[in-house]
């Protein structure tokens, strides 16, 4: 059993046994009913990517390529346009969060990255002094929230640090998330930010180090309890999945493509589970 599978099962059990039910929930299912959830607060996990520990479960298939494409949309294109996401990347799951008829998700995610020139500033800081302790991506922009409607960012802060070990520089990353759907989005969010970490490391020719993941509200929706029990019953695959970025060291951050990533030794348990998502 991989570390990710162990953490996955432990988190499911913790939510089912110790969790409390949400009140006055915002999300709704497609039929209009309120999407309540059972949740715990303060969930933390740690993976040493340099030792082959990756935050992806083998208990069900996880769509990695579309998750990586979303990261490129946010941090390379720096866009909130659904047309860009649909046409350039063939990713459509954000369409349910379109704001009115704007063709966008509001001033969120990529729009905030562009507004504050976040990626260029981050890369410049890391180039000038990798050991500075201010390498932070923050998507939490109150002014943007007041200017337009739109889903507030779930994965909203990423911090980066470097370590020199035996002459090699390792890039560590910490992802902070306000809210996370444990069964559906947990490993998607984790792996897409591992991909971002790998892109930045490649830009500088560094090694990937540790990935730290903190979630404030970790939940299972009230229509997912059957799937949760099924996941607990499943025996994990014997594979040891890892994400590989097949570009030379020093490749410019903005030149990396989704096709450059390869998920190696991934043979998840099937069949895939079905989930009715909360919007």
From Swiss-Prot:
(6R)-5,10-methylene-5,6,7,8-tetrahydrofolate binds at residues 181, 278. Its EC number is 2.1.1.45. GO terms for molecular function: thymidylate synthase activity. InterPro entries: Thymidate_synth/dCMP_Mease, Thymidate_synth/dCMP_Mease_dom, Thymidate_synth/dCMP_Mease_sf, Thymidylate_synthase, Thymidylate_synthase_AS. DUMP binds at residues 133-134, 178-181, 189, 219-221. The active site is at residue 154. Its main location: cytoplasm. It catalyses: dUMP + (6R)-5,10-methylene-5,6,7,8-tetrahydrofolate = 7,8-dihydrofolate + dTMP. Pathway: Pyrimidine metabolism; dTTP biosynthesis. Homodimer. Catalyzes the reductive methylation of 2'-deoxyuridine-5'-monophosphate (dUMP) to 2'-deoxythymidine-5'-monophosphate (dTMP) while utilizing 5,10-methylenetetrahydrofolate (mTHF) as the methyl donor and reductant in the reaction, yielding dihydrofolate (DHF) as a by-product. This enzymatic reaction provides an intracellular de novo source of dTMP, an essential precursor for DNA biosynthesis. Belongs to the thymidylate synthase family. Bacterial-type ThyA subfamily. This is Thymidylate synthase.
